[in-house]
Amino acid sequence: MEREEAERLVEAHGQAVYRLAYARTASRADAEDIVQETFLRLVRQSPEFRDDEHCRAWLLRVAANCAGDLFRSPWRRRIRPLEEAGALTAPEPEGEGDGAVAAVLALPERYRAVIHLFYYEEMSVAEIASILGLREGTVRTRLSRARDKLRAMLEGTEGTHV
């Protein structure tokens, strides 16, 4: 793959890949690692794509697979997050500490991913199923359960604002 083409694809799809990786991991560092690995695989494999949407779907599928690999890695199972170890947590980035975004980030990973792809990337249930390697019924179930959890979280916090 030519350098210019790789740079164009990073420019065109890098943010979508990052957002999915962040939705899956809730960690900026892990998301950045996944983005890097995704585009390295693109350059190494140089697959042929029918169109830009096919390329985007391929990149998101690879990113989802990389996130799964991260969760299954022996290193990941041995380490504990700093928050669990009693270290101070970093301040929330502006805008992520309130409302719906914080509620989405508080969801379990399997729900964060489908919510992100459905609402933020505007993908269909069929596209999400393909990218995450799930059945369409599973995606619909996860979307429904995620919406219920979000509704409960957001309704529980409405009365706490001054």
Residue ranges of model-derived segments:
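Structural recognition of an alpha-helix C-terminal capping motif at a helix-to-coil junction
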Residues: 19, 33-40, 44, 53-65
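DNA-recognition helix of helix-turn-helix
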Residues: 64, 68, 132-156
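Internal acidic/polar
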Residues: 69, 77-104, 124
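Residues within helix-turn-helix
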Residues: 29, 126, 137
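A short, charge-rich alpha-helical start-of-domain segment used by transcription regulators
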Residues: 1-19, 32, 43
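A short pre-motif secondary-structure segment
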Residues: 114-118
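Arg/Lys-rich amphipathic alpha helix in sigma70-family domain 2
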Residues: 47-50, 60-82, 93, 145
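Residues within the DNA-recognition helix of helix-turn-helix
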Residues: 13, 34, 142-145
